[in-house]
Amino acid sequence: MPPKDLLGDRDKAGRPEEINRWLVENGGKDKVAVISSDAMIYGSLVASRKHHIPRDLLLRRVKNIEKLHDTHPKMPIYVFSSIMRTPKDGASSGTEEPEYYVKYGKAIANYTKIDNADTSGLNESYQVTLREGVPEAALKDWLSRRRTNLEVNKPVSYTHLTL
């Protein structure tokens, strides 16, 4: 296991590049590696929910995970990912979501229920009400981060890292 000072927790992000460096240098000493993609890409699970990390840096960190197999070809590498959640309201989010979620969490949760759904049965004014219940900047931030996290998780999910 990497040194604790490299790992994140609910209050601070870890150091993905240094965790990767540690795995490259020390990974071959173990029979198997079980890796959190959230730690390797964002710094921690909580950091994956609050980040403003550029997409190109996130994708480079995904490549670091993929390269571990090349570095340690005989070591099975199991990578797990968490899909970004949408708590039902601000009270359920604790301190693990952006600050605006405390105030607008319920409205964001309701909006995301219909965001990619078939809304043909919903009254148009209800859809507008859901969108207007959240400041545009907060909704844009939330949806952008969800989209980024999904895009970054896709290559992790479909690589051949589990052998």
Question: Which role does the model predict for each range below?
Answer:
Residues 1-20:
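Basic, amphipathic N-terminal segments that precede the first structured/catalytic domain
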Residues 2-5, 34-45, 80-84:
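Short loop/turn segments at strand-loop or loop-helix junctions that form parts
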Residues 16-19, 51-65, 142-156:
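Well-ordered, non-membrane alpha-helical segments in soluble/globular domains
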Residues 17-29:
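Short, well-structured alpha-helical segments in soluble
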Residues 41-53, 91-100:
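Surface-exposed, active-site-proximal loop segments in enzymatic domains
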Residues 72-77:
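A short helix->loop->beta-strand "cap" motif at the edges of active sites that frequently abuts
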Residues 97-152:
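Acidic, His- and aromatic-enriched active-site or binding-groove loops in soluble protein domains
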Residues 159-162:
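Conserved small/polar residues in nucleotide/adenosyl-binding loops
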